Amino acid sequence: MKKNMNNRMVAKRKELLFCILMVLLPTIQFILFYIVTNVNSFFLAFKRHEYGMFEWDGIGRFVEVFNDLFKETINSNMVKEAMKNSFIVYFVGLVASLVFTLLFAYYIHKNYFGGKVFKVLLFLPNILSMLTLCFLFKFFVNRAVPEVFMDLFRKDIGIPMIDGAPTEYGLLMFAFIFFGLGTQLILYLGAMSGISDSIIEASELDGVSSIQQLWYIVIPMIFPTIKTFLVCGLAGIFTNQFNLMNFYGLGRDNDVTIGYYFYKLTTEGKANYPYIAAFGLMISAVLIPVTLIINKLLEKVEKEFV
């Protein structure tokens, strides 16, 4: 009896040690790369950079950000344009990726014709780095597409399609949406695979069409996954750089987003760090309550919808 108790104690200690080791590395990473980094950013927001040093400045950087957002300053046009573009990229990307990913995931889940081909094509961008993908995409639309038009239609497009052409913004948006489909596709497919076959078979026996099955059965049952994407996506509104860095480096002045604008500021020197930190805190002060409210609303929708 005593021996069995000792064995249980040893087993529990080993299990506890295993759990500690499993969470140790992620915990250290969270402390170093989130807490420490953000604590430093918090204090930077109340400082200014002069003569190679950071000095206490109170709310000076916050006033500067407020003026750039709501008044006419040297940087106000760029900041307002970046804010507008960030919202456009977020909402267009959200709607397009949600609709297309759900439809493609459902198509593949139903094992319709060519489903496996779509699965490979949509997940392929996740295998390569984003920089490589952008380089290949830019080469394709600037070089390959004009040559195809010339061979097939004897029509010279004239200018590169993604470098100053009227098609540039549309192609950037297409690339942004397409490159982001793979991860969502896999997660939606995983959620759909958890739906009981008996439910699907019962709906088919009742004469439910594929569209009705998607709307009334599949979407409600994978709604927690959809909700996760919707809530987490809010955090990326002002960090998304729209792949502009990968396509143009630091030389882009049009269609910039807040994420790209921040990155350009960091490369210009430490003097911009307090401004970026203050801007980030103001964004967080708005996004945190908005995210919590939307999460609560989606939870209510989930209870009624599911």
Question: Where are the language model's segments positioned?
Answer:
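Short, Lys/Arg-rich, polar N-terminal cytosolic tail immediately upstream
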Residues: 1-13
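A structural signal for multi-pass alpha-helical bundles of membrane permease subunits
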Residues: 10-306
